[in-house]
Design a protein with these regions (language model features):
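12-transmembrane solute porter fold
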Residues: 8-31, 44, 119, 200, ...
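Transmembrane-helix bundle of Major Facilitator Superfamily
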Residues: 1-183, 347
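A residue-level signal for alpha-helical anchor/packing sites in multi-pass solute transporters
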Residues: 122, 126, 156, 184, ...
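Short helix-kink/termination motifs in transmembrane helices of multi-pass secondary transporters
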Residues: 21-32, 57, 74, 166, ...
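Hydrophobic transmembrane-helix bundles of small-molecule transporters
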Residues: 159-271, 278, 302, 435-436, ...
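Interfacial helix-cap and linker-helix signal at transmembrane-aqueous boundaries
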Residues: 36-37, 68-69, 153-161, 216, ...
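Intrinsic disorder in cytosolic terminal tails and internal cytosolic loops
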Residues: 1-7, 191, 448-470
């Protein structure tokens, strides 16, 4: 079957299982917070760690999981990652206490990191070169479907069965994906001795990213003493400096320095962070603006689905609608510019259901054009042998963007004068300004990439629409 002309697309379909589940899990959990507060008898400040620990573990482990995939085989790491994720999901649904749930969420993050770090690499090495952009769009579409279903499905499951069902829903999909991956994913193992793994670099990465995320959470309203926040900020800076020094001096770095010296890669990773900041920011912002008017979590989730649905449509069909002669940078610029225009206009418009739905849909369309094109530029910036590591870096950038989107929206609402409760149109302006600036940054990054195809010899060039190199 692997030799059939359909085999690459069957492999892409298997990877879409992981893309779907990853984004479903990202958007479904937060809606269960009130139910968990009642069940465990704890405040929301404690329940927030259910999401925070998952995000910390995911960002810290993505690069190691990508390197592991390059060393021992992407199919092996991806399949075992799904197994870990599925078992941990079932265990989360049986957690007897909040502490146990937090620990199990960290185990779930281990499996998710193994999935996400290798998913983009499996797509790019499975799909035909001339169809890579379309394949990445299909994967992005699967992500958007998971993201769109999360809030509504989570609210429905919590109301009818209970919050534990939110974790159990991962189990049947996970089992199906493990079986499909065993037979449909291509073998990528390179029977060579893997390099020594950079465990000190991994620990430093865990330290500074964890401290940074805690600082961002504190800036967004988490009740931490000032001295604790200052100490965490100092730890984040010191950890980052030590991590950079380690990666520059060690013989076997976790993140090879030559990768980060690539201008297309550096721009692409920054673009990925900006794109996911704009994608996840409204998921925090809009419930604060319209949650009271809509009256239920299910209705709020249904309204929010306009953003990921627009994202999915553009990711799947943008390759057909846009001119075939356009480069990835041109496609990315068009999408980011559309999103920037929408967010910029939102600064001056009243926030109502009638205005927010088309705004979210248009912003989603723009992001659906930008993200696959940006991913293609990143994955073509180096050789296939580093594809899993690149995939891990892309997922790490997405995680950072997601975290920034959540934290900066809370901070912007605070700066707008919202201490608790719901915000009005005027109070939301700082948040929309943040989203517009992030989208404008993504557009500038894509515009800068247009010169790459005319770059000097020896540098990676952007792929043309036919799949070759221009």
């Amino acid at each position: 079957m692997r030799e059939s002309h359909r085999a690459p697309w069957l492999a892409v379909g298997v990877v879409c299982f992981g893309a779907f589940m990853g984004q479903l899990d990202a958007s479904i959990v937060t809606i269960t917070f009130p139910a968990m507060e009642r069940d465990f008898g704890v405040p929301v400040a404690a329940v927030q760690w259910v999401s925070l620990i998952y995000l910390l573990g995911l960002i810290a482990l993505l690069a190691p999981a990508g390197r592991l995939g390059d060393a021992v085989g992407r199919k092996l790491v991806y399949t075992y990652g799904f197994a870990v994720f599925t078992v941990a999901s079932a265990a989360c649904g049986l957690a007897p206490s909040l502490g146990a749930l937090v620990v199990l969420r960290l185990a779930q993050a281990v499996g998710a990191a193994m999935l996400q770090a290798n998913s983009v690499a499996l797509v790019t090495t499975s799909a035909p070169k001339q169809r890579m952009r379309f394949a990445l769009g299909v994967q992005a579409g699967a992500q958007s479907i998971g993201l769109a279903l999360g809030p509504t499905l989570g609210g429905l499951l919590t109301a009818t069965i209970g919050w534990r069902a939110v974790y159990w829903v991962n189990v049947p999909v996970g089992v199906a994906a493990i079986v499909a991956g065993r037979y449909l994913l291509p073998r990528t193992r390179q029977f060579s001795r893997p390099e020594r793994f950079d465990w000190p670099g991994t620990l430093l990465l865990v330290a500074w990213t964890s401290a940074l995320l805690l600082v961002l959470s504190a800036a967004s309203g988490l009740n931490l003493p000032a001295w604790t926040t200052a100490l965490l900020a100092a730890l984040a800076l010191a950890g980052l400096a030590a991590f950079i020094r380690r990666e520059v001096t060690t013989r076997h770095p976790l993140i090879p320095v030559w990768l980060l010296r690539s201008a297309p890669l550096a721009r692409g990773l920054a673009g990925a962070a900006c794109g996911y900041l704009v994608l996840f920011g409204p998921l925090v912002l809009i419930p604060q603006l319209l949650g009271h008017d809509l009256g239920s979590e299910a209705r709020t989730g249904l309204l929010l689905s306009a953003l990921p649905l627009g994202f999915g449509l553009a990711a799947l069909f943008g390759d057909v609608v846009l001119p075939r002669a356009w480069t990835d940078s041109q496609r990315g610029f068009a999408g980011a510019a559309l999103t920037c225009a929408v967010m910029g206009a939102s600064v001056f418009m009243p926030v109502t259901v009638q205005t927010v739905v088309p705004q979210l849909a248009l912003a989603g369309l723009g992001l659906g054009l930008f993200v696959p094109a940006n991913n293609t530029v990143i994955m073509r910036s180096t050789a296939d042998s580093s594809a899993s590591l690149l995939g891990g870096l892309v997922s790490m950038a997405r995680g950072i963007g997601t975290t920034l989107g959540i934290s900066l929206m809370a901070l912007a609402l605070h700066l707008g004068g919202v201490s608790h409760g719901y915000a009005g149109s005027t109070q939301a302006r700082p948040a929309f300004i943040v989203l517009a600036v992030a989208a404008a940054t993504a557009a500038a990054i894509a515009l800068a990439g247009r010169t790459q195809a005319r770059g000097p010899a020896g540098r990676p060039r952007e792929a043309d629409p036919s799949g070759g190199f221009s």
